[in-house]
């Protein structure tokens, strides 16, 4: 929206451009004069945007948490002479860097476990959570199968699966569940067991499972009052 762009330019020394990021051609025009592109669009647009940036021959860093496997573009990026650093946010991102640093200190690494979660300091019913990034992408954590590594093989686990309780000083008890945050670690690390889990206040898993079970996270259109809508929207 023009008014949103105006607020950005008013508080920072940046140039704002309004463009259709669903159009690869538009993305190519926007990044044409850039030395480095940072992608921070929603996950549904991440893969196509990354492809368009590689098409433009631009080095990029992306944090969009796309559902697609970015490794599918590895050969193409090399062909275009592009360096693309994907999933470089907090988790995945900083968590991956910390794992890499830790593993480098060890002679042998048998197991990698990542626990990550951004939580409000004050719990507020019913969700006891505040989205720190795009709400639609938060919901992906409750529906997208999680890739983990068991016995050296990548396997899929259901979202919200294998809950466990963990205690943290000054925070209290939190619950953890499988999420798709290993990303590149599943291919670059040689540990036979690897997983990432997201932390929430207790009770959150049961609530999200109930919403998912009732179909509210479905992407399939349903008819309501003569119109169609996707429940997740």
Where are these regions (language model features)?
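N-terminal Rossmann-like NAD(P) cofactor-binding module of classical short-chain dehydrogenase/reductase
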Residues: 31-40, 60-62
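C-terminal catalytic/substrate-binding lobe primarily of soluble NAD(P)-dependent oxidoreductases
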Residues: 105-233
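Conserved Rossmann-fold cofactor-binding substructure of NAD(P)-dependent oxidoreductases
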Residues: 18-36, 45
